[in-house]
């Protein structure tokens, strides 16, 4: 066989190296979303201040320089900004809420720096983030965690710039976790009924994470 032909054959038989899709998980916390994406072959880059989060970057997002990622294509951003100062149950001040607003704005700045890839921002629906006007340009979806396998409802808002729509309708107190029109558990620490640790309450249902990861994987 001629040398030139051999070179062509070798070139055509070489396997193409395909770079993995990448998720940037901001305020990664329990890593619920990251695990779902990793299970589908994605590379996950995470940012959080909590050492328990075992994030790629253990840093305050307000001080984190995302320029180190400019050489890498980020395919999806997920963010779960702290909800404490937005909580209706907490006696937070307007100054507290303004501090939290800065983190949400920083999230949007990072997304813009990275080319505004598909993005999801999650926060409890009972909180006040929805009243701050920061995410009005994004599609708002509501989910109830009980319809995705959790024992409590915990209605949650997910803002996105994608076409994703939850597959499960909102609960009408008729889900598998309801008895006689009431949920058997509440998303709370202490009090009557089952009690959950703070880390457990911060978890995002695996079924919901898988659904979003599958949607993003379809491109």
Which functions belong to the PLM regions below?
Residues 1-219:
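Conserved active-site and SAM-binding loop architecture
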């Amino acid at each position: 066989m001629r040398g030139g032909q051999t070179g062509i054959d070798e070139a055509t038989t070489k396997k193409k190296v395909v770079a993995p899709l990448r998720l940037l998980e901001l305020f990664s916390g329990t890593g619920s979303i990251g695990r779902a994406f990793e299970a589908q072959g994605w590379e996950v880059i995470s940012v959080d201040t909590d050492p328990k989060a075992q994030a790629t970057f253990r840093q305050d997002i307000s001080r984190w320089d995302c320029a180190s990622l400019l050489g890498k294509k980020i395919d999806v951003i997920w963010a779960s900004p702290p909800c404490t100062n937005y909580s209706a149950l907490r006696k937070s001040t307007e100054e507290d809420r303004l501090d939290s607003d800065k983190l949400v704005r920083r999230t949007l700045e990072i997304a813009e720096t990275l080319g505004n890839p598909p993005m999801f921002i999650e926060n409890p629906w009972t909180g006040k983030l929805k009243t701050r006007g920061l995410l009005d340009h994004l599609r708002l979806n509501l989910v109830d965690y009980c319809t995705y396998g959790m024992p409590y409802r915990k209605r949650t808002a997910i803002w996105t710039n994608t076409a994703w729509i939850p597959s499960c309708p909102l609960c009408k107190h008729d889900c598998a976790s309801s008895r006689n029109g009431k949920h058997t558990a509440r998303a709370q620490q202490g009090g009557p009924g089952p009690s959950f640790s703070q880390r457990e309450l911060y978890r995002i249902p695996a079924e919901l994470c898988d659904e979003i990861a599958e949607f993003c994987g379809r491109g």
